[in-house]
Amino acid sequence: MSMFLAPIHFMVYGKNQLQEQLIAEIAKRAAAEGWAEASALDAYCSREDRPLDAIIDVSNIHGWLSKSIADVEHRLAALVTELLFGHPERLAVLEELAYEVGREQAAPADAGAGELFQYLTTHLVDGMPCDGVNMMRDQTAETFRWDKTADVHSHYWTEVEGSPTVYQALRSRFVAGILSSTDYEVSTADGISFVLQKA
């Protein structure tokens, strides 16, 4: 395992921080809507905003980042599941929040399919890079196809008695927000094989 911080480690941390932003926005909206007390919602949010090199255990970089991913994934699942319990209609509000957080990170409007795929991979939490979750199948100038080789998200949701389909709905809207500045969209028929192409 690496004993030195590299750009890929900062990328992983950046993806985690972006998901932290989504959690914070959901908690903020939930408090404003009166869905829960702000003090209770705070338990799902992290106040850590220091740069990676100021907080990471450099003697265990891989382990520290893996734990950080698990933590942010678990808190998102727990928060959303709690808010939707008995109130499935709230999902539409959360989906719109996910879209807006994604839109704030909008991809370059002139990017091609391959560039957009790479952009998405630097913004979406998908386990550690060594997990190799997304495997390219083929690519053209205007199309990028890949397969998801492992499901690294669902267990966080089932552990809190939530629905993995809720996560997929939020992720889909988040991705749509990122791509909102482009002519592209991501589609899938089975949740395993994906295609990024012009709408």
What are these regions (language model features)?
Residues G191-A199:
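A beta-hairpin/wing motif
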Residues T140-G191:
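Short, hydrophobic/π-rich interface segment
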Residues M1-A141:
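N-terminal accessory segment detector
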